[in-house]
């Protein structure tokens, strides 16, 4: 969170797997109730309904504004940032993002969705919040994660933002993004999870919990039978090979370009692909995009103030 003229700029990465701000990360899960649920540790109350934040798994949907879920998750994200500074009331500028090739088409609608209430009150974790949403700034995913050092990049670089739902790729030449060389594909890490589920069921006639799959994808291993681990690792390796096949289809050349991998799916490349450390770099910070949105919004607002 950044402060500018008594306004809080809060970057929010509305991921399909996790919601991220500059300082926190929580699952993109939400369950709504008409009556107060039994367990209320992570409960948000808004508009007369009760929401458990982080519960369940929100399925991939290209249109994030089709229901209230991402709006309520946004309120929770803002509350988490404000709580870190012991605030419950503030004027807010939301800095958010959309997949690269969807930004221009969905930008106005997503901004209107997040700004539908210029003033909003809600309760989160028994704390009462009063927000004034002064503005929403929307930026392209992928680029935001490297925005703070983009101008230092030399030569031809490819940015691959591998999220849970989508993979966004963007070419940078001497620090400048190439408008005509950016791509968005529905090929995020969750596609790998689905492939593991299917392969595991076919080979063992058993179901496997997503928590185990996630552990293997993130760390490269898990305390399970070696035969079961082999199935997961085999599918993950094939998924990563497919990532690089797609990158090459978009013109990626490992010998002449540097690849920057961002997003939660970067761990799959680390764990299941043999790469040259000189040619493949990782943006390790899971909150990098949210921080990038804040960086871009602050720079933009300051530039506008100067006229």
Where are the regions a protein language model picked out?
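Nucleotide/phosphate-binding catalytic cleft detector across ATP-hydrolyzing
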Residues: 1-159, 176-191, 203, 211-307
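Ser/Thr-glycine-rich phosphate-binding loops at phosphate-binding pockets of nucleotides
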Residues: 162-168
């Amino acid at each position: 969170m950044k402060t500018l003229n008594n306004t809080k700029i809060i970057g929010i990465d509305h991921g399909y797997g996790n919601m991220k701000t500059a300082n926190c990360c929580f699952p993109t899960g939400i369950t709504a109730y008409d009556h107060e649920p039994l367990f209320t540790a992570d409960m948000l109350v808004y508009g007369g309904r009760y929401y458990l934040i982080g519960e369940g798994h929100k399925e991939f949907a290209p249109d994030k504004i089709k229901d209230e879920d991402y709006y309520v998750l946004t309120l929770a994200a803002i509350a988490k940032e404000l709580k870190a500074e012991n605030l419950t009331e503030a004027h807010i500028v939301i800095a958010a993002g959309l997949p690269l090739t969807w930004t221009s088409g969905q930008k106005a609608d997503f901004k209107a969705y997040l700004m539908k209430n210029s003033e909003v009150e809600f309760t989160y974790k028994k704390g009462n919040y009063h927000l004034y949403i002064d503005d929403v700034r929307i930026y392209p995913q992928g680029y935001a994660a490297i925005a703070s050092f983009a101008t230092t990049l030399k030569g031809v670089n490819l940015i691959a933002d591998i999220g849970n739902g989508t993979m966004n790729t963007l070419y940078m030449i001497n620090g400048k993004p190439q408008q005509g060389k950016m791509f968005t594909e529905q090929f995020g890490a969750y596609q790998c999870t689905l492939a593991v589920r299917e392969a595991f069921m076919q080979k063992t006639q058993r179901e496997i919990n997503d928590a185990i799959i996630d552990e293997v994808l993130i760390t490269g291993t898990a305390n399970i039978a070696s035969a079961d681990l082999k199935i997961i690792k085999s599918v993950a390796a094939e998924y990563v090979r497919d990532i690089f096949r797609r990158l090459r289809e978009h013109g990626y050349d490992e010998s002449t370009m540097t690849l920057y991998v961002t997003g939660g799916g970067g761990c799959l490349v680390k764990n299941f692909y043999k790469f040259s450390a000189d040619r493949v770099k990782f943006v390790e910070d899971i909150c990098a995009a949210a921080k990038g949105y804040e960086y871009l919004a602050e720079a933009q607002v300051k530039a506008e103030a100067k006229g």
